[in-house]
Amino acid sequence: TLEDSIAFARLLKQEGIGLAVMGEIPLVVINVQRGGPSTGQPTKVEQGDMLTAIFGSHGDAPKVVIAPATIEDCFYSVITARKIAETFNMVVVVLTDTSLASSQQAFPRPQFSEAWLAPPIDQSEIPPGLKPYDWDAKTGLARRFIPGQPGGMHTLTGLAHDRLSHVAYDPDSNELGIRARSHKLAALQQTLKTPTVFGGDKGDLLVIGWGSTKGAIEEAVEKLRAEGRKVSSLHLTFLQPMAPGIKEIMQQFKKVITIEGNWSDDPKDEIIDESNRRYSALATLLRSRYLIDVDCWSEVRGAPIKPATIQRVVLEKLKQK
């Protein structure tokens, strides 16, 4: 199933997304971010939906979140998302934004590859005794039962259920299901490649970004490096789960900062201090996951962040002790 939605409309569909998580129904959701909250700025650029995409829905609802950086990335990200959704029986959110949605880019005509496809669905008769949610103890994966499949009759429900798909409210069944759905994220994470650093592998400052800010960040980093600054950048495509090796990359730099199009408090404001400062979305994730002091700078002016602005911000951060 493929669902395409602007950010505001997607919030109205959280119950359906939660059903897909609980029932382990493959689903790709394309979320085109724009200014919010509420009606906000319908035609303006913003990156305010990351945390909603990852944590949205009541209860524990693990989802994969991919953020393409270019028009070409958008094409291939949907292919990747569908393959992951069908391989792991999960919800995959493709998190794009108004900047990409309203842009045009020429790229080489794609040549079809068998690698794009998920493994074919096994539609053979279900062997006696095989359970519809026969979760693997390590990966959480289970064979997908298809409606109408011989021997595959089962209940598809948003209620907590056991391995037989029967509604079950007992503590053991509920915890077993949650563990299985969570382990699928870990199983996917182990297949991901460590992202490539743009610039040197170590230095004074690492800029981390996601989504459509990639071009502006790399242009700024390239100019700063031409001036002799020991600055590099890292752009993340997988936001949930995050690829392996990110912590080790960050540890090679004296300072780490995220550049994003969502809100973060300015520490220069009189009322803001370290006890009440709100960090940007990606900085919040990185700080909590890797326990590294990640700083952030963000802009929510309804327009793409400019390379010159990023250069200025990075130079200011380099001067700070």
Identify the meaning behind each predicted range.
Residues 1-55, 64-86, 226:
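Thiamine diphosphate
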Residues 2, 46-49, 62, 152, ...:
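Generic structural motif recognizing short loop/turn segments at the entrances and edges of beta-strands
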Residues 27-29, 63-65, 233, 294-297:
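Conserved beta-strand scaffold positions in the cores of enzyme catalytic domains, especially
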Residues 31-34, 57, 70, 98-99, ...:
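A broadly conserved detector of short glycine/acidic/proline-rich loop/turn motifs that flank catalytic sites
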Residues 52-59, 286-290:
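Short, conserved catalytic or adaptor-binding loops enriched in Gly and charged residues
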Residues 59-60, 201:
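Short glycine-enriched loop/turn motifs at secondary-structure junctions
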Residues 77, 82-321:
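Flexible, low-complexity linker and terminal segments
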